[in-house]
Amino acid sequence: MIKQIKRKKVKKNVVVGVVHIQASFNNTIVTITDLGGNTLSTGSAGAVGFKGARKGTPFAAQLASEKAAEKATEYGLKKVEVLVKGQGSGRETAVRAIQNSDIEITAITDITSIPFNGCRPPKRRRV
């Protein structure tokens, strides 16, 4: 039988990174990358344990960003720039949860795409 070679996973030491927060009405996804765009950690409301309509709540976004920040601090992350996309309810709480962790925020930018009269939007909901 051939012996398998086990390679040790090299932990990168990253000091500066970027936090991408994608907040839709149904879910909030937090991805923390280095400046090159390589993913260090991710967190989403579904991965934390929420299902269905509860994934879109601000509390779920808070727990998702706390989990992602906790994983990213293992890489030695100290300063981040925050990029927020979408108009979901978890936008502010996700940013606030990262502020409360050990990571210092240098800039907060909104990168939500707005059409210059592009595609026709879906019809209005009648509830």
Curated annotation (Swiss-Prot):
Part of the 30S ribosomal subunit. HAMAP family: Ribosomal_uS11. Its main location: plastid. Gene3D superfamilies: Ribosomal protein S11. Keywords: Chloroplast, Plastid, Ribonucleoprotein, Ribosomal protein, RNA-binding, rRNA-binding. It is found in: Plastid, Chloroplast. Belongs to the universal ribosomal protein uS11 family. This is Small ribosomal subunit protein uS11c. GO terms for biological process: translation.
